[in-house]
């Protein structure tokens, strides 16, 4: 409450399980005026399920958006004046929904009437308001244009570059998978452009492309991670039910095991091929990430997160977010649905230009400016 201004408010969404209606959603509203948080009941999850939405982008289609607005925003809107700043913290299913992107009946977006700011937790509001100039060493590690198919000899050569003997991240034998991950052609160009933007500002940048972006290279950042970590690669997230169809993931039920990132050479492990001795598989789960110390990293950017396998669920998105938070990362920027390589690349270049050219290290302002530019 102390971090809010007069024209600002916080919506902290929550959920609970009812014996009669299953999972239900509610929202705590906090502003500068009220002495205590206001609790508003919203809807049962089965009401959203009944709409027949099977992909996150469908929330914003005309046939569904109005029903979503009635369930999610109509019970809340009386508490916010137009033009005010509304911070919000999602919960469960709501991780899939961007409030500002919901279309209104008149064709405008909800975000054109309010300034929405999405947070990973209410605590993030306090940190954000500090808005200090970042005095960390300007270092960045960029992954993109990765080669997911590699010969065993190439995998061995890349693995030899890193000594991971002190890293306690032991995993069992790889089991069989099925489909493969395709090259993200625009991601290499994206990394080259972002590297150029950062180097113009005298940043120390290391880029991993092609065969170089291995799991070994990622784990080697443990306890010596960069200020910025940019990952333009495939991500995957599965529900426990869907995971049963993927041999690689069978037997796992928690979101931290069913979500992750694919690095160089990852197809071999995903397909269940025998890996050379001393070589890691290139499939980095959220659990693997959570075990690392990435405390030096102020921001992780996942710019191609949904372009891989499976359905982007709230649990899956939350799995990756939680993993990087547990590893000590300050801010996570990630996509909720697929965007073309060209648009993604243009947005990322604009985002980094806005970020490094500002007098203050303000990630959220840079993000908003980049959206307007692209």
Q: In which residue ranges do the predicted regions lie?
A:
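Catalytic cores of enzymes
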Residues: 1-55, 59-374
């Amino acid at each position: 409450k102390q971090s809010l201004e007069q024209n600002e408010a916080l919506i902290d969404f929550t959920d609970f399980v009812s014996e009669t209606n299953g999972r239900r959603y509610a929202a705590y509203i906090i502003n500068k005026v009220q002495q205590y948080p206001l609790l508003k009941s919203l809807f049962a999850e089965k009401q959203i399920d009944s709409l027949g939405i099977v992909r996150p982008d469908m929330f914003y289609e005309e046939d569904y958006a109005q029903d979503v607005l009635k369930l999610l925003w109509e019970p809340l809107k009386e508490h916010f004046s137009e033009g005010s700043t509304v911070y919000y913290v999602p919960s469960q299913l709501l991780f899939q929904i961007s409030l500002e992107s919901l279309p209104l009946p008149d064709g405008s977006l909800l975000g054109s009437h309010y300034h929405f700011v999405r947070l990973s937790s209410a605590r993030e509001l306090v940190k954000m308001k500090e808005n200090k100039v970042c005095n960390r060493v300007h270092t960045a590690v960029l992954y993109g244009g990765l080669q997911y198919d590699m010969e065993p000899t190439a995998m061995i050569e890349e693995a030899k570059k890193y000594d991971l003997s002190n890293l306690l991240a032991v995993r069992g034998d790889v089991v069989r998978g099925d489909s493969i991950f395709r090259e993200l052609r625009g991601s290499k160009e994206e990394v080259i452009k972002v590297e150029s933007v950062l180097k113009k500002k005298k940043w120390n940048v290391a880029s991993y492309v092609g065969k170089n972006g291995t799991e070994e290279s990622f784990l080697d950042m443990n306890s010596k991670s960069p200020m910025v970590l940019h990952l333009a690669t495939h991500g995957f997230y599965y529900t426990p039910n869907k995971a049963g169809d993927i041999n690689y993931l069978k037997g796992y039920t928690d979101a931290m095991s069913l979500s992750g990132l694919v690095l160089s050479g990852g197809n071999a492990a995903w397909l269940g091929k025998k890996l050379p001795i001393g070589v890691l598989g290139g499939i980095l789960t959220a659990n693997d990430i959570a075990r690392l110390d990435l405390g030096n990293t102020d921001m992780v950017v996942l710019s191609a997160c949904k372009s891989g396998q499976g359905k982007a669920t709230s649990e899956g998105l939350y799995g990756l977010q939680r993993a990087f938070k547990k590893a000590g990362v300050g801010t996570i920027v990630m996509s909720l649905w697929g965007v073309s390589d060209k648009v993604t690349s243009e947005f990322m270049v604009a985002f980094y230009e806005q970020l490094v050219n500002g007098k203050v290290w303000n990630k959220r302002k840079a993000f908003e400016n980049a959206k307007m530019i692209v």
